[in-house]
């Protein structure tokens, strides 16, 4: 609205408006509300609860004790509020998206059914299942009683384990505050660590409080020398694995007792049940309509880039775009929360607030009362979430967790990594909010795309063909202070960003991918993106071992010794003007684990050779010489590897899913199936890494070293085999004698590079068509001759020409005409456009022009010194022409100033820099001297290099740095030689493989053959 009916009760108080509550609120109100254009805030304290203006009406944001605030009341008015539950126990079908672990103490007995009270005396674990009811889509919280936390211990002879456990609890300060129920029973289990372990007696120690597990386990290990097993398994995983449940999917409860009072959650419906009441419906992969929210914030930076702990750096607007997963992409509800009045925005619900505090309460309650399950945004983990939570906690003393989906014991936090200060956008920050699946689309795009930068505008253009209207943060204060119309423009920009992010979520369908990984890995969805791959494989291994009565020991220091990682066949650097065939091992590391039956349970370590008794070398077991000695692994017919069994079952399942996918016509079901097979692929590829991470959940570096040893051996065997093949051998691979035209009898195969799981084969003397003809047959023949299933070599791609620089760095043109670059930056991203474009021209010429390619091949096969004695091949002169023309363009002023600009971020105040001898700081100081507008912190300062005064040679960069606008306005000549040297250095880095793979040698050749015309 335009502001006619909006008033700020905290600047013009109306004492009779509301009943005074007990609480006093701090509000920071922009001065521009009183004086248009004014900066700063007014500090106001008072008892009025948070308020909101919407469609000419004033409403209280919060609600009663049941949490029914403005958003809930709005739903009730629209008729979309959900019905209450029945008042008696009845069957319940519901879908689960999150699983929480909570603890009840005996004080809760009065509010739970009498038959459940025994589970929580003196305390007990209550698993909360959050999801949606099948009947009507209402949000539900199901409290599940009866789950236990436990671990196993192998005790020395004569130790009274129960007494030792009780002693540990007595010594715990935590247990004195919260008494814990304990039970100890003898069970028969087998340790997964090492082949030949017989079933034996172990003590299963069950505790009613999960926080006691770690203390008791450590006590038994350190004080009594017990070997501990599975003390790092939480109650949530026990709940899922012990009962063969799912972390995302449909459940049925045969007797769900509604909780009508004293609820734990703000879900629309809440129930109590026992573990035994539940069952899962795995066959149903459908989804209910979950609510997804994309949000974005706009902030006020009083002194440059906004800082959350500065009182005046307010959050001005929060855009919220809502989408139901059951709807088509694009059918969004758009909401804008804004400080002050705002003109109407078409298609957007605009809610106006008198202060930031009121708006923050509304935002948190929107997530809660509109039953949001998935929250996304762009770089929200690094900026938006920390900013909102810091403002809430440090400025207003709001506890965001208290406004979440759980009334008590919830979590709402941002965990910044230790290196978070190294750079904006560079750190992987974790967001943990109870009952929400946080998905940062910035991190998703970084993982799935390869772009020059990952700004939202760049990504939106690339994926969606959408142009993002940008507002620089310097414009935000002016627009906001301009009044309702300025806030409308700012709001349009803010809502647009959230809508684009929701489009990206739907483009990648990342929420489905997360759910499928969660299901296969037995972990909650919220742990998929942030907790890495270790937990996925650990949970799967735990499940497989549990079915066979095996248990997993806790890792010890001896498990963490180092080993030699994967190596490569050193590249023969140079330019190859003949076809280069690349063959890959399909799923190399998983296939090695399967082929050689590698596992914790099949391994016999040095010193344990007595376990080999009765086994035949080569037939019953294989031996590998590793860093720590000779290790043996028994073969599948003796004992099947758990890791190999997991991989085999996953890959079989993936194959079946891909078969279903090929026949499926329903778009939604196709998406789910596709994400299922991708989830399996991702988890399979994580198995090797799981064993090789020294500080992981269950490391076994001897397995990881065996895998890499076999990988190296396979590469070397394949190299020798391929290089021994003659044209006649290749001709014999034809499907029939007349299927192929005769191959060139002078042709020769040579492996020029081997990279972990692939070989680069130079097909010298063979044409492109000949190479493509025998590529698949060559890979299949090598596989049959050298390897056992499931190891398989496949022809992946063929280059028509290739610049091989160093390991993991090459540029080539594929046979379909596309250029492929790996590990190569043409020039540094910080280079100016002039250098970038000219270097690209050089590369394109070398890869595309037939005469230049021939000359490049000649140069790369002779010592670089011959270029000085014999000169450059004639075919290479067009490259020199490009460089000479660039110099002429510079000297004659034909290069636009914009192409010569560099830029560096002003990361902190000038006084905070240890040294100011940097070009961008030199320009900053010139701004000060000229009394010009100064850049703010986080601004990028542009600069060019100009000729030093008096033409002094060897001047420092800081003396040559100048503001581009000033240089252009005053006709200051640019430093021609400096820019040309930058160009030659960039070109030399690209062309180094032509000159003994030495960038210094390449630079000296280019300097020698480029002509710098006299002034």
Curated annotation (Swiss-Prot):
Keywords: DNA replication, DNA-binding, DNA-directed DNA polymerase, Early protein, Host nucleus, Nucleotidyltransferase, Transferase, Viral DNA replication. It is an enzyme of class 2 (transferase). It is found in: Host nucleus. Its EC number is 2.7.7.7. It comes from the Viruses. The keyword Phosphoprotein does not apply. Pfam families: DNA_pol_B (PF00136), DNA_pol_B_exo1 (PF03104). It catalyses: DNA(n) + a 2'-deoxyribonucleoside 5'-triphosphate = DNA(n+1) + diphosphate. The keyword Lipid biosynthesis does not apply. GO terms for biological process: base-excision repair, gap-filling; bidirectional double-stranded viral DNA replication; DNA replication proofreading; nucleotide-excision repair, DNA gap filling. SUPFAM superfamilies: DNA/RNA polymerases, Ribonuclease H-like. Replicates viral genomic DNA in the late phase of lytic infection, producing long concatemeric DNA. The replication complex is composed of six viral proteins: the DNA polymerase, processivity factor, primase, primase-associated factor, helicase, and ssDNA-binding protein. Belongs to the DNA polymerase type-B family. Forms a complex with the ssDNA-binding protein BALF2, the DNA polymerase processivity factor BMRF1, and the alkaline exonuclease BGLF5. Interacts with the putative helicase-primase complex composed of BBLF4, BSLF1 and BBLF2/3 proteins; these interactions may coordinate leading and lagging strand DNA synthesis at the replication fork. This is DNA polymerase catalytic subunit. It comes from Epstein-Barr virus (strain B95-8) (HHV-4).
């Amino acid at each position: 609205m335009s502001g006619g009916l909006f008033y700020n009760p905290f600047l013009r108080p109306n004492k009779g408006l509301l009943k005074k509550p007990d609480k006093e609120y701090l509000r920071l109100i922009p001065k521009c509300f009183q004086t248009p254009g004014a900066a700063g805030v007014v500090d106001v304290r008072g008892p009025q609860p948070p308020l909101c203006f919407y469609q000419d009406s004033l409403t209280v944001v919060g609600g009663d004790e049941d949490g029914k605030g403005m958003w809930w009341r709005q739903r009730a008015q629209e008729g979309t509020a959900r019905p209450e539950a029945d008042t008696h126990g009845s069957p319940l079908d519901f879908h689960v998206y999150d699983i929480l672990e909570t603890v009840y103490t005996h004080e809760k007995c009065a509010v739970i059914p009498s038959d459940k009270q025994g589970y929580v005396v003196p305390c007990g674990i209550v698993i909360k299942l959050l999801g949606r009811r099948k009947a009507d889509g209402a949000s539900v919280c199901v409290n599940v009683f009866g789950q236990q936390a436990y671990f196993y211990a192998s005790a020395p002879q004569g130790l009274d384990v129960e007494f030792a456990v009780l002693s540990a609890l007595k010594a715990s300060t935590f247990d004195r505050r919260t008494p814990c129920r304990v039970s100890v029973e003898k069970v028969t289990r087998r340790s997964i660590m090492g082949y030949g372990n017989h079933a034996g007696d172990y003590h299963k120690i069950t505790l009613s409080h999960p926080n006691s597990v770690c203390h008791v386990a450590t006590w038994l290990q350190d004080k009594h020398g017990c070997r501990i097993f599975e003390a790092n398994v939480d109650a949530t995983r026990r709940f899922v694995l012990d009962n063969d449940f799912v972390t995302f999917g449909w459940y049925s409860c045969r007797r769900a007792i509604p909780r009508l009072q004293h609820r734990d959650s703000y879900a629309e419906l809440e129930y109590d049940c026992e573990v035994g009441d539940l069952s899962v419906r795995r066959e149903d992969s459908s989804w209910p309509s979950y609510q997804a929210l994309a949000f974005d914030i706009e902030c006020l930076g009083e002194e440059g880039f906004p800082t959350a702990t500065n009182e005046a750096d307010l959050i001005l607007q929060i855009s919220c775009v809502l989408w139901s997963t059951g709807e088509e992409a694009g059918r969004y509800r758009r909401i804008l929360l804004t400080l002050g009045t705002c003109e109407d925005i078409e298609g957007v619900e605009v809610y106006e607030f008198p202060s930031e505090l009121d708006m923050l309460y509304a935002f948190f309650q929107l997530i809660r009362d509109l039953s949001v399950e998935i929250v996304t945004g762009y770089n929200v983990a690094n900026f938006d979430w920390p900013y909102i939570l810091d403002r809430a906690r440090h400025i207003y003393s709001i506890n965001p967790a208290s406004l979440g989906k759980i009334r008590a014991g919830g979590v709402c936090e941002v965990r910044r990594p230790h290196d978070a200060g190294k750079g904006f956008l560079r750190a992987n920050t974790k967001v943990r909010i109870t009952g929400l699946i946080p998905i940062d689309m910035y991190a998703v795009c970084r993982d799935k795309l390869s772009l020059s930068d990952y700004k939202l505008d760049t990504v939106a253009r690339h994926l969606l063909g959408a142009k993002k209207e940008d507002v620089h943060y310097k414009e935000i204060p002016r627009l906001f202070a301009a009044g309702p119309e300025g806030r409308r423009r700012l709001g349009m920009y803010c809502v647009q960003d959230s809508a684009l992010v929701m489009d990206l979520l739907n483009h990648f369908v990342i929420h489905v991918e997360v759910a499928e990984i969660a299901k296969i890995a037995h972990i909650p969805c919220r742990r998929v993106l942030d907790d890495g791959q270790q937990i996925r494989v650990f949970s799967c291994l735990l499940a497989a071992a549990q079915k066979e009565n095996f248990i997993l020991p806790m890792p010890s220091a001896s498990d963490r010794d180092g080993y030699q990682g994967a190596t490569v066949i050193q590249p023969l650097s140079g330019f190859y003007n003949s076809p280069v065939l690349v063959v890959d091992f399909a799923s190399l590391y998983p296939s090695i684990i399967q082929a050689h039956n590698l596992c914790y349970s099949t391994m016999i370590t040095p010193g344990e050779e007595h376990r080999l008794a009765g086994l035949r070398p080569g037939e019953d077991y294989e031996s590998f010489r590793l860093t720590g000695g000779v290790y043996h692994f028994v073969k599948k017919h003796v004992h099947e590897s758990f890791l190999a069994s997991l991989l085999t079952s996953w890959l079989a399942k993936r194959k079946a899913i891909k078969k279903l996918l090929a026949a499926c016509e329903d778009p939604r079901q196709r998406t789910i199936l596709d994400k299922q097979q991708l989830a399996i692929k991702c988890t399979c590829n994580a198995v090797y890494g799981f064993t090789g991470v020294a500080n992981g959940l269950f490391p076994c570096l001897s397995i990881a070293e065996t895998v890499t040893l076999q990988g190296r051996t396979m590469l070397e065997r394949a190299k020798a085999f391929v290089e021994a093949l003659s044209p006649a051998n290749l001709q014999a691979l034809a499907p029939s004698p007349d299927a192929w035209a005769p191959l060139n009898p002078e042709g020769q195969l040579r492996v020029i590079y081997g990279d972990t799981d692939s070989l680069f084969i130079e097909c010298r003397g063979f044409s492109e068509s000949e190479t493509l003809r025998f590529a698949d047959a060559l890979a299949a023949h090598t596989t049959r001759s050298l390897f056992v299933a499931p190891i398989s070599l496949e022809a992946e791609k063929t280059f028509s020409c290739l610049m091989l620089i160093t390991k993991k760095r090459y540029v080539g043109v594929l046979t379909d005409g596309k250029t492929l670059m790996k590990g190569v930056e043409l020039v540094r991203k910080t280079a100016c456009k002039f250098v970038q474009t000219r270097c690209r021209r050089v590369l394109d010429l070398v890869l595309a022009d037939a005469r230049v390619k021939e000359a490049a091949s000649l140069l790369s096969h002779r010592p670089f010194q011959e270029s000085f004695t014999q000169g450059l091949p004639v075919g290479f002169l067009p490259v020199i022409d490009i460089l000479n023309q660039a110099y002429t363009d510079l000297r004659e002023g034909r290069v636009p100033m914009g192409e010569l600009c560099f830029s560096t971020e002003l990361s902190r105040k000038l006084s905070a820099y240890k040294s100011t001898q940097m070009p961008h700081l030199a320009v900053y100081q010139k701004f000060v001297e000229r009394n010009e507008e100064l850049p703010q912190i986080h601004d990028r300062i542009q600069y060019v290099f100009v000729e030093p005064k008096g033409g002094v040679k060897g001047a420092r960069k800081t003396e040559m740095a100048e503001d581009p606008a000033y240089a252009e306005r005053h006709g200051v000549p640019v430093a021609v030689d400096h820019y040309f040297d930058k160009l030659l250095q960039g070109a030399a880095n690209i062309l180094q493989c032509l000159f003994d793979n030495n960038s210094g040698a390449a630079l000296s050749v280019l300097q020698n053959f480029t002509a710098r015309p006299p002034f």
